[in-house]
Amino acid sequence: MLIVGKNDFKLAPVVQNDPNGGGLYFLNIVKRTYAIKDDIGSLEAIPEEEQPDIVGAKSYKDDYGRSQKYPGDSGACKQLIDVIINGCAFAPEGEAVEELDVTINIAGKHKTLRVFGNRHWERNEAGGVDISATQPFTTMPIRWEKAFGSLSNRWNPLGMGSEKDHETDPEDPLFSLPNVENPEDLLTQFGQKVRPVGFSAIPEAWEPRRSFFGTRSAYWSSFRAPLPPKDQDLRYLNAAPEDQQFGDLIGNEIIILTNMHERFSEMAIKLPDSKPRLFYVPRKRPVDLQDTELDLQDTELIETYLKLDTVVIDLNEKFLTLVWKGKLESQINVLDTFLYMYGVEDSCEPSKSIGEIQRKFEEEIVALEWAREMIDENPEKKINKVVSDVTDQIVKTLKELKADPALISLLASTATLDEKEKMLRAEFDNLKESLEKDLMKQKEKIRSWGNAPSTNFEETN
C-alpha cells in the first residue's frame, strides 16, 4: 500500500471486522497534533517529523496513580465527538485559596467543577463526624484520583472519599475527602455517595462504559467474540464524560477555560478550522501487496468521508490533538486495491472539487514516477539517498566514540560517496586501534592487582 500526499498528518488504515457480520473493512484514522504556543492559547501545527503516532490508550504512571491519560486512537467510529481535557486548577494570581471553580465552555455547553484543598473527615466533641478545615492550595491536578471514588466504586476505582486510604492513621477509621466535586452535588454528610466528576477520559472497564459494552455471556465469548455483543450500546465507544460529547464540531469553535492556566484566570483555545480530505483509488488492474507501481490509468479518486472523532487538550504538556475517522465499506476489496492521498482544507473556504484534486493528484504521480526513474537510471543517487537517510545516526555514534570532527563534518557535506567511504574506513581503523590499546591497558592493570601486596580492591585500585 502506498500513501501519496501531505504528510503533516498521521494516517493509519486499520483492518477491522464489521460487527454486523459484513466482513472486513478499512477504518481510516487520521491524526494531527498542534502545540499550544502561548498564553492566549494560539495553536501551531507540530512539524511533520515530530507528529505523534496513532497509538493505543495511555495511562499516567506517577505518584498520584494510574488513571487514563488519553484514550486510544483506534476503535470504531463514535456517534458523538469526544472532547477530553487534562490539566490543573490554579489559584488566581498564585495566591493560595481553600476552594475555587474551574469551568470549560465548549460550543454552548458549560461545565463547572469545584476544587478544594486537602480535607478529611474528623470526629467532633459530640461523637459525630464533620469535615475538617481545608488546607489552602495554589495548584491541584484535575484527575480521577482526586475525585470521589474507591476501589469498590465502579465509576471511579481510583478515587477517594468513600473508603479509608492507605496513608490514614490505622487508629483513625476516617479518611480523606475528594478534591474535585460537582458544585451541585457536594459531599456534606459522612457516608454520602456522589457521582465522580472530571474532565478526563473514562476507561472502558469503568461505568458507564462497562454497562454499555453489552452482555458478556458464555455464548458471546464462545461464538461471537472478538465481535462485540449484539446488544452493545454504541455509547460504549465514547471515552469523554457524557457532558463533554458533541454531535458536531466543524472547527472555529472557541473553548474557554477558567482557572486552568498558571498566570491567567481565563484562557481561550480556538479549534483548528482545517480538516483533512482522504481519497482512495480502486486500481484497474490486478496487483499484489508488494506492488507500488503507478500509472495514470490508476488515478480515479473516490472520497471517503472523514468525521471528527476525538479532541484531546493537554494543558500540562501544552498540545491539542484531533483525530478523524472514516470507513471504507466492506464490499471493497481491502487487501490490495488502494492508494491513498489526503490534503487539508479550511472549513471556512469552499471545498475543492474532485476534479481539482484529481489534477493535483495526477501531477504528484507524474513527479513520483520521474523520481523513480531517476533513481533507477542512476544507482549512485539511490545509494547516496540511503547514506543520507542514516547519516544522522552515524554522526551520533561517531560523536559518542569521540571520532575525528573532520569526519563528522565530511559526512554532513556533499562529498562523494567514495570520499566518505575512504575516510570512514580510516577512522574506524583508528578507533579500533585505540580501543585495543585501552583494552591492553586495562588487562595490565588487572594483572597488577594480583601482584600487589594487599588484595583489598579499594587500596589497590
Language model feature labels by segment:
Residues 291, 396, 413-415, 454, ...:
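Intrinsically disordered/low-complexity terminal segments and short unstructured peptides
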Residues 2-380, 385, 392, 451, ...:
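Extended intrinsically disordered or low-complexity segments
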Residues 365, 369-372, 376, 384-391, ...:
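Residue-level detector of alpha-helical secondary structure
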